[in-house]
Amino acid sequence: MVKSERVKKVRGTASVLDTASYDKLINTLANNDSTGKWPAKAPYPLPGAILPYHRIVAFYGNLYSKRMGILGEVPKNEMLKKLQGEVAKWQAADSSLPVIPALHYVAVTAQGTGGKDSKYRLRMPFHQIDTIVNWAKEINALVFVDIQVAHSTVKDEVLALEKYLQMPNVNLELILNFP
């Protein structure tokens, strides 16, 4: 399956959300809780949403750090093989939901010092993000671009990564930590 087919399949083409089916799935995922406290009440997702209709197994990290996660710890081919192995294990353990691989890349890291602009964050170069996007294409994976905002603003960091966030398989993760 090529990337565009995977994205279309994952995102779905439904124009209307089947709320009864959604409610049933959410209740099942919450182990049919009878207290009424779980699952927490929340707005319905948009039609074609990935969650809760799929399980995502993601490998995390930053290519400049061996201590931040597996993306920087092991060579690409070994890491992708391990990720595909984990996806297969999860799919075998529970076939009720399709399992999707993902690469979760920390594209903006909080820093202990202010840096040139006193924002206490460091943006990774675009060529590193391009690398992750290309690796994801090889295995039809999702990409999560992780932003540790620090003293910057969500708006500034999102705008800096806008070209990636417009890609159909790229998603945003925000971490609002302050060193």
Give the location of each predicted region:
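Alpha/beta catalytic barrel-like cores
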Residues: M1-P125
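Substrate-binding cleft of extracellular glycoside hydrolase catalytic domains
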Residues: K89-Q91, P98-N177
